[in-house]
Amino acid sequence: MEGGCGSQWKAAGLLFCVMVFASAERPVFTNHFLVELHKDGEEEARQVAAEHGFGVRKLPFAEGLYHFYHNGLAKAKRRRSLHHKRQLERDPRIKMALQQEGFDRKKRGYRDINEIDINMNDPLFTKQWYLFNTGQADGTPGLDLNVAEAWELGYTGKGVTIGIMDDGIDYLHPDLAYNYNSDASYDFSSNDPYPYPRYTDDWFNSHGTRCAGEVSAAASNNICGVGVAYNSKVAGIRMLDQPFMTDIIEASSISHMPQLIDIYSASWGPTDNGKTVDGPRELTLQAMADGVNKGRGGKGSIYVWASGDGGSYDDCNCDGYASSMWTISINSAINDGRTALYDESCSSTLASTFSNGRKRNPEAGVATTDLYGNCTLRHSGTSAAAPEAAGVFALALEANVDLTWRDMQHLTVLTSKRNQLHDEVHQWRRNGVGLEFNHLFGYGVLDAGAMVKMAKDWKTVPERFHCVGGSVQNPEKIPPTGKLVLTLQTNACEGKENFVRYLEHVQAVITVNATRRGDLNINMTSPMGTKSILLSRRPRDDDSKVGFDKWPFMTTHTWGEDARGTWTLELGFVGSAPQKGLLKEWTLMLHGTQSAPYIDQVVRDYQSKLAMSKKQELEEELDEAVERSLQSILRKN
């Protein structure tokens, strides 16, 4: 079972980890309340809510917890509604009533690079270079998602539903209507089953409709373009369009219809301003954990997240959604393989797809559906990248409905390719087991053809275990110049039930303060020599009070490695002015399997990463068997 990390929070009999946030800003209170009843039951909850003038929804991921909302209250204000809170607390049937605080969540659609209106009279399929790159808009031929191979094999996303968690979907759009799944859709901003975008003169709420078209736009209907998984179904989950986000709305959206929705696509997150450190709150963490444990009949909901649009001034490891083990974080490249100007780099990004963010050529953007039956060529940002990945994953799920959420991450690592991607800052490197990765692009660009072929024969990976590899609790000063270097020796819980031999995710849970948080640089090196940049410089972050409080920095760069040995943590400052800092805690969290995940997989391509990894696993198994035999002989003698 998956749990969180950080401080613990108990609800509905389950123990979860909570990311701790602190802010100097005054809180904003919303018209949403988290309510727990002494006697559980939806009829009881409806009666209690009605008596107090509230609407009500049951939270699907927790027993006895309900979402009460009051349309007569202001959606956002600086003071608590003490009258309504006390009214609820005085009711003997109510055990707890907590008014929800509001916080910012931003869509990850980069500003338009070119505002020229494009004539949309003709279908846009030939302009969808991310599907078939023949060199359109001065792109690099062949640099695409390789969907052609998947389609030729007969995989188009049939039987798979993707939920777009966003500002709504124009489900009346002729290119989306046929594939729209109304049963799996809901509007959490207005509390009704019709997630249609709210009208604005500037079409601000076109974000979700554009993302939906990338995934599920119908094929061969002479309208706009074609979705990556054009026979998949798309569900609209409207949840972004209100003055402030709340934990209860995020949690409800992430846990909506987990037996109907297979993949959740999120192109939003905390503000990408280069100085925010934020992530999911208690209820949302619980909903995510519930999703990967129970969604899709126990195979786990698949959460796809845009890595962020903060550019070189930000680091996506400061985003608790993109850096979560339970999400697949996706970055973007432009059509010639270069990085987009808005791309954030971090060690938690798993792979990349495509968007625009450098070129002014009007056809270099992502072609997709737009509001009110229109089409656009101007979709961009990592907002465009995440839905493309969701579409590729839908093709893989059609090829093998038994894939778990972890299987999808393994397939992503094994089938993504460097192709012709080019990062001007970070070199491509190989980790301790030979897997090639990049600090910005992850393990490379998704390859739909390779993924569906491997998915067809895929055997579910072994059980996952969690090990606290060790902890440094003594405060250590970070010098103004040079680095603080700490080491941890771990056996990865060998000899115990939770022994982790083959790594998936690694977290460094860190508490640290600095006179200027943005100048802090943190690196961690594994026993097999793989260096992960956990935190890079963020020049706009001038925080000197909050720091990081039990923040789980995550890396995927040590995937497949042996965790046993010495881990090294390096902390220092990068900047023109001298700074001071204090590391209060470093806890090493190891997540992975005891048995080799690829040793029983079918290899079709003997040049593939799977073939290389399986060969290495077989050699390691043989070496360990020989070692055990020698030790047995020595003991007998």
UniProtKB/Swiss-Prot annotation:
<keyword id="KW-0325">Glycoprotein</keyword>
<dbReference type="GO" id="GO:0030425">
    <property type="term" value="C:dendrite"/>
</dbReference>
<feature type="glycosylation site" description="N-linked (GlcNAc...) asparagine">
    <location>
        <position position="523"/>
    </location>
</feature>
<dbReference type="InterPro" id="IPR038466">
    <property type="entry name" value="S8_pro-domain_sf"/>
</dbReference>
<feature type="disulfide bond">
    <location>
        <begin position="224"/>
        <end position="375"/>
    </location>
</feature>
<dbReference type="GO" id="GO:0030141">
    <property type="term" value="C:secretory granule"/>
</dbReference>
<dbReference type="Pfam" id="PF00082">
    <property type="entry name" value="Peptidase_S8"/>
</dbReference>
<dbReference type="GO" id="GO:0004252">
    <property type="term" value="F:serine-type endopeptidase activity"/>
</dbReference>
<comment type="function">
    <text>Serine endopeptidase which is involved in the processing of hormone and other protein precursors at sites comprised of pairs of basic amino acid residues. Responsible for the release of glucagon from proglucagon in pancreatic A cells.</text>
</comment>
<keyword id="KW-0645">Protease</keyword>
<feature type="active site" description="Charge relay system">
    <location>
        <position position="383"/>
    </location>
</feature>
<dbReference type="GO" id="GO:0006508">
    <property type="term" value="P:proteolysis"/>
</dbReference>
<dbReference type="InterPro" id="IPR022398">
    <property type="entry name" value="Peptidase_S8_His-AS"/>
</dbReference>
<keyword id="KW-0968">Cytoplasmic vesicle</keyword>
<dbReference type="GO" id="GO:0034774">
    <property type="term" value="C:secretory granule lumen"/>
</dbReference>
<dbReference type="InterPro" id="IPR008979">
    <property type="entry name" value="Galactose-bd-like_sf"/>
</dbReference>
<dbReference type="InterPro" id="IPR034182">
    <property type="entry name" value="Kexin/furin"/>
</dbReference>
<dbReference type="GO" id="GO:0030070">
    <property type="term" value="P:insulin processing"/>
</dbReference>
<dbReference type="GO" id="GO:0016485">
    <property type="term" value="P:protein processing"/>
</dbReference>
<keyword id="KW-0964">Secreted</keyword>
<dbReference type="InterPro" id="IPR002884">
    <property type="entry name" value="P_dom"/>
</dbReference>
<feature type="glycosylation site" description="N-linked (GlcNAc...) asparagine">
    <location>
        <position position="374"/>
    </location>
</feature>
<dbReference type="InterPro" id="IPR015500">
    <property type="entry name" value="Peptidase_S8_subtilisin-rel"/>
</dbReference>
<dbReference type="Pfam" id="PF16470">
    <property type="entry name" value="S8_pro-domain"/>
</dbReference>
<dbReference type="GO" id="GO:0016540">
    <property type="term" value="P:protein autoprocessing"/>
</dbReference>
<feature type="signal peptide">
    <location>
        <begin position="1"/>
        <end position="24"/>
    </location>
</feature>
<keyword id="KW-0732">Signal</keyword>
<dbReference type="InterPro" id="IPR032815">
    <property type="entry name" value="S8_pro-domain"/>
</dbReference>
<feature type="disulfide bond">
    <location>
        <begin position="316"/>
        <end position="346"/>
    </location>
</feature>
<dbReference type="GO" id="GO:0030133">
    <property type="term" value="C:transport vesicle"/>
</dbReference>
<feature type="disulfide bond">
    <location>
        <begin position="467"/>
        <end position="493"/>
    </location>
</feature>
<dbReference type="GO" id="GO:0034231">
    <property type="term" value="P:islet amyloid polypeptide processing"/>
</dbReference>
<dbReference type="InterPro" id="IPR023828">
    <property type="entry name" value="Peptidase_S8_Ser-AS"/>
</dbReference>
<dbReference type="InterPro" id="IPR023827">
    <property type="entry name" value="Peptidase_S8_Asp-AS"/>
</dbReference>
<keyword id="KW-0865">Zymogen</keyword>
<dbReference type="GO" id="GO:0016020">
    <property type="term" value="C:membrane"/>
</dbReference>
<dbReference type="GO" id="GO:0005615">
    <property type="term" value="C:extracellular space"/>
</dbReference>
<protein>
    <recommendedName>
        <fullName>Neuroendocrine convertase 2</fullName>
        <ecNumber>3.4.21.94</ecNumber>
    </recommendedName>
</protein>
<dbReference type="GO" id="GO:0043025">
    <property type="term" value="C:neuronal cell body"/>
</dbReference>
<keyword id="KW-0720">Serine protease</keyword>
<dbReference type="GO" id="GO:0004175">
    <property type="term" value="F:endopeptidase activity"/>
</dbReference>
<dbReference type="Pfam" id="PF01483">
    <property type="entry name" value="P_proprotein"/>
</dbReference>
